[in-house]
């Protein structure tokens, strides 16, 4: 599956950071992680750091799938508002999922500090804007729901929103628990640290093409006919997992993004806040460490790569128009535009944990607008699953829900 197209900003900015060899021999490991994007790198960092003998394989170069196309806003907010999620999955599961998102962003901040390498991580506020009067009623209800659950939020009136941020909206929820990151560089940093300090092994251009199981082991055959014998497998294959599972667990769409030219004297409110609104599909934006603005959205309900690619330019103009309406006093010049695949689940929660059709195997599928945050949650969830420890999120995020 072609996961991205156009000039993905993170790849253009960073180039190929590290390359790894393809697998050229039969190997044995404790845990095989299939997928070397941001999810696979987070899980590999966690498990190798706990002493497991971990191998990561990726059919591309590390993080050249959807990881280098994501806009990498880090949000605790889930695509399904809290008050609606409570109706779908219950108060405890919904509230726990939101609060764990906050904890995950702080966890990543500590992890980045531990590695000591720049990946563009910046803690930011998050501003969720009502774009019309009807959505303001829903957003007001969402504010009350979050506030009643002890989440630190502030309500901004239309006047406050304009006065503080020059944003055109009817009102907004302001949260202190957001961030942004260069996800492509972060993934490379995680893998480099784990290979250097924890003995992680990584193989690029190595595709798993066949899987066999017995009562004790998993046997994975690669496209070059080498064998990987693993006690456990973790699938971190993102949207391509749809081709592996018979279950219809996600609807795939196309999403678009543009990054501006660098902005001299970028306003502080743009550098320290991420924004998104209540439109469907919603508009979202963030700044980068080199003073650009990334604008994303304009989703389409298909994922055919040829069709998606054919309208990148058109979608770029649409995003610029949407940005102009959202922040009319700010003028930006687009530099690069690109497209990627985006998925949504029935309840906007991820699928993390075992699957009945895959013995001794686990999936970390952080679908949705805050997929990176879900993947950070997956670090502890998969660690607990492998060790036989209980974890309530294994129940919340299971396939059979």
Which role fits each region the language model picked out?
Residues 27-56:
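N-terminal Rossmann-like FAD-binding beta1-loop-alpha1 element of flavoenzymes
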Residues 106, 114-122, 208-213, 226-357:
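Active-site substrate-recognition segment that forms the wall
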């Amino acid at each position: 599956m072609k996961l991205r197209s156009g000039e993905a900003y993170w790849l253009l900015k960073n180039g190929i950071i590290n390359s790894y060899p393809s697998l050229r021999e039969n190997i044995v490991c404790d845990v095989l992680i299939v997928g070397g994007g941001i999810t696979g790198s987070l899980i590999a960092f966690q498990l190798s750091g706990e002493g497991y003998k971990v191998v990561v394989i990726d059919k591309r170069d590390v993080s050249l799938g959807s990881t280098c196309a994501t806009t990498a806003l880090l949000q605790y907010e889930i695509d399904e508002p809290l008050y609606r999620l409570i109706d779908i999955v219950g108060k405890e599961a919904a509230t726990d999922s939101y609060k764990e998102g906050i904890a995950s962003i702080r966890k990543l901040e500590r992890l980045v500090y531990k590695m000591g390498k720049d990946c563009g991580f910046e803690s930011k506020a998050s501003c969720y804007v009502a774009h019309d009067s009807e959505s303001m009623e829903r957003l007001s209800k969402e504010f009350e729901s979050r506030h009643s659950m002890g989440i630190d939020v502030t309500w901004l009136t239309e006047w406050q929103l304009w006065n503080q941020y020059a944003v055109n909206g009817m009102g907004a929820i302001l949260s202190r628990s957001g961030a942004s990151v260069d996800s492509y560089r972060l993934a490379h940093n995680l893998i480099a640290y784990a290979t250097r300090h924890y003995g992680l092994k990584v193989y690029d251009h190595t595709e798993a093409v066949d899987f066999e199981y017995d009562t004790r082991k998993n046997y994975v055959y690669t496209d070059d006919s080498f064998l990987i014998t693993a006690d456990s497998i973790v699938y971190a294959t993102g949207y391509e997992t749809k081709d592996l599972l018979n279950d219809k667990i996600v609807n795939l769409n196309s999403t678009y993004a543009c990054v501006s030219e660098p902005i001299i004297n970028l306003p502080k409110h743009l550098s320290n806040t991420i924004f998104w609104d209540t439109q469907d599909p919603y508009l979202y934006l963030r700044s980068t460490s080199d003073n650009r603005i990334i604008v994303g959205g304009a989703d389409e309900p298909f994922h055919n790569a040829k069709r998606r690619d054919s309208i990148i330019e058109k979608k770029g103009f649409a995003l610029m128009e949407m940005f102009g309406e959202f922040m009319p006093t700010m003028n930006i010049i687009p530099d690069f535009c690109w497209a990627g695949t985006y998925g949504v689940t029935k309840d906007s929660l991820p699928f993390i944990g075992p699957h009945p059709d895959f013995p001794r195997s686990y999936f970390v599928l952080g679908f949705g607008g805050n997929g990176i945050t879900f993947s950070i949650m997956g670090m502890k969830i998969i660690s607990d699953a492998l060790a036989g420890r209980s974890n309530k999120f294994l129940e919340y995020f299971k396939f059979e829900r």
